[in-house]
């Protein structure tokens, strides 16, 4: 095989004949592996860049044909690493090597090396005139970051890619970027933002979206039920209740409880656990242990119906101390998640109007305890 390479580099053999000759000069894959490495050393020393590059591509084709995954991986690595430093190293060749290695690492579930290989593809490639290929690469890289547990890097990759996707006006790519972004935000506990991205995915009219429609609708609902309680979350739940197939969500009974503004508690969190992803289960278990999430949601429910309450009545109903209720309400007001004022001397909480109360129930402090009992049933 080495003689064939020398002969070709000297210009004494056409490319097609050279490639045919390569296939005839080995009897087993191990021998091919060793001969290919020796041929690489020969062509790396050639100053005939055009011929050298032909040899490189031919050797890569030979490497890809090796059936042994381990030998194939090792030979492609051997063909890639030294060529990076060569003068006028062909970018297309380097990209091909990295993509072949990425495929192998993905099959091995070696996500760290998969990410490195895909990063190298972007480094070596020239995508200025092919933004769609760049975006496909970024989507694959974002997915690899998620599998590696680097969700923050996935978010950064996607956010720098979305403006490019708008340039090429490709809804399929935009949808896949939004889905990757949603999963990354979901995994980092940014549940409201994740819900927004999952919801955007539902809006794209692209082939195949109907197949994942219900799954993404479930993801929107899951994230909203895990998000920090706020009027925005409740309004968002109201909006998704208008979506087709919403009643097919396996935990719709809990969504309906929110829609009807029925008090929720730790038992509702426990009910949701079997429908959550592993990282969401961890988060929900924290919410169940703490309990504050459910109290905040119930206070938001009350704020839509009543103008006045008191810390003492709320504390008695929710079996908490007045100090605990006062702290929670104060925090929600400070964080602008509750439009209310607190009279700490008298212990009254005045829920300020936003768009008008949901209905005209009595608004007297001395009647709230009775109403609460009925409301919570």
UniProtKB/Swiss-Prot annotation:
Alphabetized InterPro entries for the sequence: PCI_dom, PSMD12/CSN4, TPR-like_helical_dom_sf, WH-like_DNA-bd_sf, WH_DNA-bd_sf
GO terms for biological process, alphabetical: protein deneddylation
PCI domain mapped to chain residues: 190-356
Keywords on record: Cytoplasm, Nucleus, Signalosome
GO cellular component: COP9 signalosome; cytoplasm; cytosol; nucleus; proteasome regulatory particle, lid subcomplex
Claim: Nucleus is one of the keywords in the record: yes
Location(s), subcellular: Cytoplasm; Nucleus
Main localization (coarse): cytoplasm
Its biological purpose: Component of the COP9 signalosome (CSN) complex that acts as an regulator of the ubiquitin (Ubl) conjugation pathway by mediating the deneddylation of the cullin subunit of SCF-type E3 ubiquitin-protein ligase complexes.
Subunit description: Component of the COP9 signalosome (CSN) complex composed of at least csn1, csn2, csn4 and csn5 subunits.
UniProt similarity note: Belongs to the CSN4 family.
The protein, known as: COP9 signalosome complex subunit 4
């Amino acid at each position: 095989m080495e003689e064939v390479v020398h002969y070709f580099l000297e210009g004494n053999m056409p490319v097609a004949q050279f490639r045919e000759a390569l296939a005839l000069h080995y009897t087993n894959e191990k021998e091919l592996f060793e001969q290919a490495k020796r041929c690489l050393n020969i062509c790396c020393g050639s100053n005939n860049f055009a011929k050298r590059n032909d040899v490189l591509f031919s050797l890569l084709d030979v490497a890809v044909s090796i059936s042994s995954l381990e030998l194939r991986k090792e030979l492609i690595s051997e063909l890639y690493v030294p060529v990076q430093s060569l003068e006028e190293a062909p970018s297309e060749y380097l990209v091909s090597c990295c993509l072949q290695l990425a495929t192998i690492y993905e099959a091995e579930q070696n996500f760290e090396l998969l990410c490195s290989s895909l990063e190298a593809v972007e480094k070596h490639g020239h995508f200025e005139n092919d933004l769609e290929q760049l975006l496909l690469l970024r989507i694959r890289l974002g997915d690899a970051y998620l599998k590696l547990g680097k969700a923050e890097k996935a978010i950064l990759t996607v956010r720098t890619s979305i403006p490019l996707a708008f340039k090429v006006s490709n809804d399929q790519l935009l949808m896949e970027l939004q889905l990757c972004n949603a999963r990354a935000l979901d995994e980092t506990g940014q549940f409201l933002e994740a819900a927004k991205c999952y919801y955007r995915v539902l809006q794209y009219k692209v082939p195949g979206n109907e197949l994942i429609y219900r799954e993404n609708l479930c993801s929107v609902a899951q994230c909203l039920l895990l998000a920090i309680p706020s009027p925005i979350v409740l309004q968002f739940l109201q909006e998704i209740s208008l979506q087709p197939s919403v009643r097919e969500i396996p935990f719709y009974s809990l969504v309906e409880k929110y829609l009807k503004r029925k008090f929720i508690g730790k038992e509702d969190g426990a009910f949701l656990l079997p429908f959550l992803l592993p990282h969401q289960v961890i988060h929900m278990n924290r919410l169940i242990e703490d309990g504050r999430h459910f109290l905040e949601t119930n206070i938001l429910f009350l704020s839509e119906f009543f103008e006045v309450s008191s810390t003492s009545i709320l504390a008695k109903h929710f079996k908490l101390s007045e100090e605990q209720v006062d702290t929670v309400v104060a925090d929600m007001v400070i964080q602008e998640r509750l439009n209310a004022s607190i009279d700490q001397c008298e212990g009254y909480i005045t829920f300020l109007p936003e768009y008008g109360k949901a209905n005209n129930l009595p608004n007297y402090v001395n009647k709230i305890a009775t109403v609460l009992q009925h409301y919570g049933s």
